């Protein structure tokens, strides 16, 4: 695929570098809407410039205005009278590349500290508490060149939130006691990443360039860089934070985006009032004209040992910064071709040889002044032995592009696809939208900020050739990641401990690559037949319903249909669940269902890639009840793709070579689960404990050896022999078209796979284990990879119902911010601290998830201590404060989906849970508004208090790698810290030694009754 953003290579990294999503200039008039509103400066000295002509999509109903304040802050204002949440973001064009050389992670630490009190609002959790009380949330991230802060809040409270937010940039406190505690949060954040291959590889790439270049810095920081070493060197880190903020948090390096219901004039006045006081220190914008990879860092090979059993090949070329060429985007053009996955592509040829499974190619962001061009593949066992040949094929393909020369029709196709994507893009969620825009305001003229990432304008063959000229063997860096290098390395990266070996690539290999000839197997892509041409929005039908309607109900299928009446874009979402009792009957069948669908997707890839480029994608996966298929995107060519998928499902022939390769990759993924985070392990074990039927990773691994090609071939017709299909077709389609689509699916399966309906008795769902009153069970396991503990504590409350849902959700709303403030900010238990509802199989409860270096039984005691403080807190709460929580939860629940796929996912959740409560939000919020403080206290005392008569508790304790053992419960005297609230004395829990025995001894809950009477639902 074409490489889109820096984080595709490093999915865990918070590095939202400049996007390369396409490119960018005012589009043809037909595709653009211009702002009508104008606003004069009214001689306001705080405003230097106003941009009233922001180019936007004609489908975009929001109004925009750009500002440049006199102090240099760039601003984009968005007025959306329909928004439920308001949002704002501020991006400082400074990041970890500007850290002082002796205090790694200072910019990241500064980001953490700004949340913890300002002169105007000194209370440590004032900002987060205000947001929590008004249905809001906030976050921030630090990357090499950016620190980006953002929040959302109920639309009535934008001004109060923005006032608290603006103080971050005017007068933060950097309180000494907060600093001493928050350094632990940064350290815990780093510790979470230490055994993560994406972070390790990213740091190793930085470490193997020029050590004097800022790119080589360690950006996250940890306790050693932010406390221990500065203390040894006599450096006062609080003074350094003040100095850093004072030096770099200058208005000329800031960009702000604000979205609200207010008019553009009101938003203008608000931003001017709050942000024109930020001081302009005229800080020069950091630029990095020298590339971190110089002559001595090229023609090098790095052999790297990963944590997980993965095999990857990374081929990297240094290239100049292409940002200024955004109107022609030569990197996009080359990424489109090198990363193509259709017939005749580089991936197609490498896959046919059995060497690779996936390929990503394209430009990757560096910083102002430098970029990279990458070609990354994941290797098969065979591919690991043919790295030299794989890279030769890459250079053969690059040679093909040189020989053919830049093709204007390819550029035109990219331009058309991007123009369609821009015109019909989904409405964004406010928080993500403001954060993204604040980040890109630094790079484009105000008028082009919405179009720049999409619209291409100039075909520049000279620039394409310039970039192509950089993709030569003498410029290459190669990294191979494989467990096979264990014990054969001689170097260790400083911060993550990654083992690697560096070798110069021999001259004869470079020469061989330089002499790469043309390979007849390579072809440029053909014209894309999936580009939509019909964008007609169908008129609403007379019998259109506000919620999905059941328009077909037979032994073979249930079809739910909803014509879109909100978004009016030429898109649809088609969701299908194929129920089969064979899919999960035992671990062997579960493995076979998984492999069947992985092989099917693998064989469809060349065909479906063109559809994906044209905005039409599909998802296919095995589930505990059968198979799930969704097709999303432009409705014009949707039935063509769907028909192809169903035909392929019903007539699939397995390729033996691909079977072996994909089975081996599956075995590695099962083995790699051991390296997941401790808190993820805790969640996994709890699911195994609470669900009636769930196969473990070990059971699946054991059964995988029994999956042979003949066995899998025999399984597919068995799986398809009897099915029940439940579907939701939602979007720009008619009822008649929906019935036709469903008929096509059924007819195809009947014709090719002779599918018959399941019996109704075969459609029963799995149920949840019912814990006894006053029961407390503990299950312990160790994580062999990470040196942190993880815990999930689950208080099972009851079956889902309108009343039970609202008791639980309101309690979670009330404790959410205090939980984070107490357990993470004050007690510093760890970076990951979460509380909220857990729901599965119609049963629910309250859960706490924590990852920490502290032992699980200590975490357990702190959660119990916290719950006791919450009882008093709720009892002492004023009626006004209680009503604020009800209002905040109501706003969250009634927050409208922003796009078709989000609304569809909501309805689909009701269908697959078989609850069918499509109007859930309105009915539950109506009930919520009747609740009193006494109701919540009663709920707490009955279900959650230590001595509650209906308390049902399970705790999963995941021990850190180096912990030999740990008691399940312990006493922790408070005298070591007078600020800690008293933990209650806990009874001895029942330790679960064997999951099966545990489940065998307990009853199961019944299933929740459907909300719909099916006889009445039929139209």
Swiss-Prot record:
GO biological process terms, semicolon-separated: amyloid-beta clearance; amyloid-beta clearance by cellular catabolic process; amyloid-beta metabolic process; antigen processing and presentation of endogenous peptide antigen via MHC class I; bradykinin catabolic process; hormone catabolic process; insulin catabolic process; insulin metabolic process
MF-aspect GO terms: amyloid-beta binding; ATP binding; ATP hydrolysis activity; beta-endorphin binding; endopeptidase activity; identical protein binding; insulin binding; metalloendopeptidase activity
Enzyme Commission designation: 3.4.24.56
Catalytically driven reaction(s): Degradation of insulin, glucagon and other polypeptides. No action on proteins
Cofactor: Zn(2+)
Activity regulation comment: Activated by small peptides. Activated by ATP and GTP, and to a lesser extent by CTP, TTP and PPPi. Inhibited by bacitracin. In vitro modification of Cys residues impairs enzyme activity.
Residues annotated to bind substrate: 336-342, 359-363
Consequence of changing residue 496 to A: Strongly reduced enzyme activity
The keyword Ribosomal protein belongs to this UniProt entry's keyword annotation: no
Record's subcellular location: Cytoplasm, Cytosol; Cell membrane; Secreted
Residues at which ATP binds: 429, 895-901
InterPro entries listed in its UniProt record: Metalloenz_LuxS/M16, Pept_M16_N, Pept_M16_Zn_BS, Peptidase_M16, Peptidase_M16_C, Peptidase_M16_M, PqqF-like_C_4
Domain notes: The SlyX motif may be involved in the non-conventional secretion of the protein.
Other comment: ATP-binding induces a conformation change.
Family classification: Belongs to the peptidase M16 family.
Protein name in the entry: Insulin-degrading enzyme
């Amino acid at each position: 695929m074409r490489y889109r953003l820096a984080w595709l290579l490093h999915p865990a990294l918070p590095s939202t570098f400049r996007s390369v999503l396409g490119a960018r200039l005012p589009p043809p008039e037909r595709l653009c809407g211009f702002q009508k509103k104008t606003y004069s400066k009214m001689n306001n000295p705080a405003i230097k410039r106003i941009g009233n002509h922001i180019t936007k999509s004609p489908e975009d109903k929001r109004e925009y205005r750009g500002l440049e304040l006199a102090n240099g802050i760039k601003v984009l204002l968005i007025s959306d009278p329909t928004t439920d949440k308001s949002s704002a973001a501020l991006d400082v064009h400074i990041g970890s590349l500007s850290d002082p050389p002796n205090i790694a992670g200072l910019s990241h630490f500064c980001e953490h500290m700004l949340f913890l009190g300002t002169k105007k609002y000194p209370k440590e959790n004032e900002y987060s508490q205000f947001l929590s009380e008004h249905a809001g949330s906030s976050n921030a991230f630090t990357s090499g060149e950016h620190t980006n802060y953002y929040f959302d809040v109920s639309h009535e409270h934008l001004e109060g939130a923005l006032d608290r937010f603006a103080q971050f940039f005017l007068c933060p406190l950097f309180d000494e006691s907060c600093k001493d505690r928050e350094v632990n949060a940064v350290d815990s954040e780093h510790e979470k990443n230490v055994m993560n291959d994406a972070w390790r590889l990213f740091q190793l790439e930085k470490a193997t360039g020029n050590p004097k270049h800022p790119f080589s810095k360690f950006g996250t920081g940890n306790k050693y860089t932010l406390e221990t070493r500065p203390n040894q060197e006599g450096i006062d880190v609080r003074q350094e934070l003040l100095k850093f903020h004072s030096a770099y948090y200058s208005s000329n390096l800031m960009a702000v985006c604000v979205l609200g219901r207010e008019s553009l004039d009101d938003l203008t006045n608000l931003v001017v009032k709050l942000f024109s006081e930020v001081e302009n220190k005229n800080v020069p914008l950091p630029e990095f004209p020298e590339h971190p990879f110089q002559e001595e860092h090229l023609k090098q090979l790095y052999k790297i040992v990963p944590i997980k059993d993965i095999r990857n090949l990374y081929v990297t070329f240094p290239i100049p910064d292409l940002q200024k060429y955004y109107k022609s985007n030569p990197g996009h053009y080359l990424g489109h071709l090198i990363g193509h996955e259709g017939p005749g592509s580089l991936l197609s040829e490498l896959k046919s040889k059995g060497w690779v499974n996936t390929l990503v190619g394209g430009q990757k962001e560096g910083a102002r002044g430098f970029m990279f061009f990458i070609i990354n593949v994941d290797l098969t066992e065979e591919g690991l032995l043919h790295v030299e040949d794989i890279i030769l094929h890459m250079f053969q393909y690059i040679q093909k592009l040189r020989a053919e020369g830049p093709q204007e029709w390819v550029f035109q196709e990219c331009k058309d696809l991007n123009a369609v994507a821009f015109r019909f893009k989904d409405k964004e969620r406010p928080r993500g939208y403001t954060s993204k825009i604040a980040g890109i305001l630094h790079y484009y003229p105000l008028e082009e900020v919405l179009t720049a990432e999409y619209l291409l304008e100039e075909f520049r063959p000279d620039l394409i050739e310039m970039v192509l000229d950089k993709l030569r063997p003498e410029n290459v860096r190669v990294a191979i990641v494989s467990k096979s290098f264990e014990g054969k390395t001689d170097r260790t990266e400083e911060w993550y401990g990654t083992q690697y070996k560096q070798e110069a690539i021999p001259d004869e290999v470079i020469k061989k690559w330089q002499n790469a000839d043309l390979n007849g197997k390579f072809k440029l892509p053909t014209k894309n037949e999936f580009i939509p041409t019909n964008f007609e929005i169908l008129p609403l039908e007379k019998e259109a319903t506000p919620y999905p309607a059941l328009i077909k109900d037979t032994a073979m299928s249930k079809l739910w249909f909803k014509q879109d009446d909100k978004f009016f874009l030429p898109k649809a979402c088609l969701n299908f669940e194929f129920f089969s009792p064979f899919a999960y009957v035992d671990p062997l069948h579960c493995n076979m269902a998984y492999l069947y669908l992985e092989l099917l997707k693998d064989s469809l890839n060349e065909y479906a890639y063109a559809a994906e480029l044209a905005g039409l994608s599909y998802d296919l996966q095995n589930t505990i009840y059968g198979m799930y298929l969704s097709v999303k995107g432009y409705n014009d060519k949707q039935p063509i793709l769907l028909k192809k998928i169903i035909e392929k499902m019903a007539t699939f022939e397995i390729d033996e070579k691909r079977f072996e390769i994909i089975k081996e990759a599956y075995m590695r993924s099962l083995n790699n689960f051991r390296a997941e985070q401790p808190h993820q392990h805790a969640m996994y074990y709890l699911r195994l404990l609470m669900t009636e039927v769930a196969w473990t990773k070990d059971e699946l691994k054991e059964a995988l050896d029994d999956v042979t090609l003949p066995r899998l071939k025999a399984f597919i017709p068995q799986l398809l022999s009897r099915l029940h299909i439940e579907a939701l077709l939602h979007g720009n389609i008619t009822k008649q078209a929906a019935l036709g689509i469903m008929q096509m699916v059924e007819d195809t399966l009947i014709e090719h796979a002779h599918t018959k309906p399941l019996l109704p008795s075969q459609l029963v769902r799995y149920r949840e284990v019912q814990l006894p009153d006053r029961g407390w069970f503990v299950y312990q396991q160790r994580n062999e990879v990470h040196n942190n503990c993880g815990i999930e504590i689950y208080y099972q409350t009851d079956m889902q119902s309108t009343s039970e849902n609202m008791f639980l959700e309101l309690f979670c709303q009330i404790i959410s911010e205090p939980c984070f403030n107490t357990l993470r900010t004050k007690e510093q238990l760890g970076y990951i601290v979460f509380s909220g509802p857990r729901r599965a199989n119609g049963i629910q409860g309250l859960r706490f998830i924590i990852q920490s270096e502290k032992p699980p039984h200590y975490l357990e005691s702190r959660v119990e201590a916290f719950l006791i403080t919450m009882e008093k807190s709720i009892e002492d709460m004023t009626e006004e404060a209680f009503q604020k929580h009800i209002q905040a939860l109501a706003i969250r629940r009634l927050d409208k989906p922003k796009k078709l796929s989000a609304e569809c996912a909501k309805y689909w959740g009701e269908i697959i849970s078989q609850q069918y409560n499509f109007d859930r939000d309105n009915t539950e919020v109506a009930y919520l508004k009747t609740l009193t403080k006494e109701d919540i206290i009663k709920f707490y005392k009955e279900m959650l208090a230590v001595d509650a008569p209906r308390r049902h508790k399970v705790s999963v304790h995941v021990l850190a790698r180096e912990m030999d053992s740990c008691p399940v419960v312990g006493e922790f005297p408070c005298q070591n810290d007078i600020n800690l609230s008293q933990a209650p004395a806990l009874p001895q829990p029942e330790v679960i030694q064997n999951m099966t025995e545990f489940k065998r001894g307990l009853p199961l809950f019944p299933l929740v009754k459907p909300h719909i009477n099916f006889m009445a639902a039929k139209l």
